[in-house]
């Protein structure tokens, strides 16, 4: 079977779907088209063939987007895939439309709602309208949480088959349980993700600075690339000793291993992968009570929740974690690991894809 994958970047495909690629490549010819990036060579090592496909993943230029759809049509005509898998909004919409025009079956993954839908207004209306067109004939639409699925069904964006999967899951072996840190120098919170407003970076910096003023031994490690310009804010917080900014790291596992608690005050997620990784490592977590985050932890069992866009609520949750004994935090981390083993094993996601691919191949659409 010839399978084509359309996505907007290599990082998500490699970090969260590498095992799926490896599984698919065993019995199929798999081709992936996306803009070249840092992880492209590693993706090729899975057995997947790479085709460069550059486009603006953030812009909303109608002419540029129309050209992207035309290029997808040209690509599909050339490759003649038996099935197309799409991820992220533009490949979902324009790849989906191209598949419809050429009558090629496709399976879509809605990895999150994104700001274009969350913020409402004209852009939200336009995005929903495009999604209705792009997902209209999908063999199956995967969602990463029930709230997103419910919204798409309520607005009749999806009328056909859909199902919820546990995000991208987590590789339990790759993110193996690590002994909770004993003693050491101070207490380390850890944020892993893009440095941008929608990830809650402003609330995190403010809360970290306030806590550090009271407790000099508490530091927040920030790991990730800066999608937006927070250079000055990061510099001020780092000079105060409240944070350490590590930038983008190719391997975040050592940071999970040495932290005492992972924090993600995100405004919205499909499923918060960093919460899965931290929990799998055996660390308690703090995250917002929003779809895609709230499902990844059990309140007071594996971590604490806070209100979205609420610095005081975040600070309270962080201080609540600090007030626990080390043994209580360790117990939380062990409970978090068990939750990942039972609910978020990446093999569950792979099995769901294999089921839908088999179903599509057999014509049960």
Model-flagged regions — what are they?
Residues 86-92, 110:
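Short His-centered aromatic/hydrophobic patch
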Residues 299-300, 304-312, 320-326:
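Conserved acidic donor-binding segment of nucleotide-sugar-dependent glycosyltransferases
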Residues 248, 267:
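Aromatic "clamp/platform" in nucleotide-sugar-dependent glycosyltransferases that forms part
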């Amino acid at each position: 079977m010839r399978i084509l994958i359309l996505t907007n970047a290599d990082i998500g495909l490699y970090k969260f779907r590498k095992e799926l690629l490896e599984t698919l490549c065993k019995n199929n010819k798999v081709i992936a088209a996306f803009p070249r990036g840092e992880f492209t060579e590693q993706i090729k090592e899975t057995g997947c063939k790479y085709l460069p496909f550059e486009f603006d993943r953030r812009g909303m230029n109608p002419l540029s987007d129309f050209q992207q759809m035309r290029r997808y049509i040209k690509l599909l005509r050339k490759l003649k895939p038996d099935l197309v898998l799409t991820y992220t909004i533009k490949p979902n919409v324009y790849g989906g439309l191209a598949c419809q025009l050429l009558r090629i079956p496709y399976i879509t993954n809605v990895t999150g709602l994104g700001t274009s839908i969350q913020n409402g207004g004209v852009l939200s209306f336009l995005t929903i309208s495009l999604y209705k067109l792009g997902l209209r004939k999908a063999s199956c639409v995967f969602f990463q949480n029930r709230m997103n699925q419910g919204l798409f069904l309520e607005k009749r964006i999806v009328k056909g088959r859909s199902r919820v999967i546990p995000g991208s899951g987590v590789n339990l072996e790759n993110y193996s349980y690590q002994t909770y840190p004993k003693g050491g120098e101070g207490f380390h919170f850890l944020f892993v993700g893009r440095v941008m407003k929608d990830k809650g970076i402003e609330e995190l910096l403010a809360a970290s600075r306030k806590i550090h003023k009271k407790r000099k031994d508490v530091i927040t490690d920030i790991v990730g690339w800066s999608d937006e310009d927070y250079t000055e804010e990061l510099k001020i917080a780092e000079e105060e000793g409240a944070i350490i900014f590590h930038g983008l790291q190719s391997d975040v596992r050592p940071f999970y291993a040495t932290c005492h608690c992972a924090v993600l005050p995100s405004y919205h997620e499909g499923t918060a992968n960093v919460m899965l990784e931290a929990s799998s490592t055996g660390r308690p977590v703090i995250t917002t009570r929003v779809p895609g985050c709230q499902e990844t932890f059990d309140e007071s069992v594996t971590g604490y929740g806070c209100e979205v866009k609420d610095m005081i609520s975040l600070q309270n949750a962080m201080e609540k974690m600090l007030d626990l004994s080390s043994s209580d935090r360790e117990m939380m981390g062990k409970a978090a690991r068990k939750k990942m083993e039972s609910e978020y094993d990446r093999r569950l996601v792979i099995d769901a894809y294999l089921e839908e691919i088999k179903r599509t191949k057999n014509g049960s659409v």
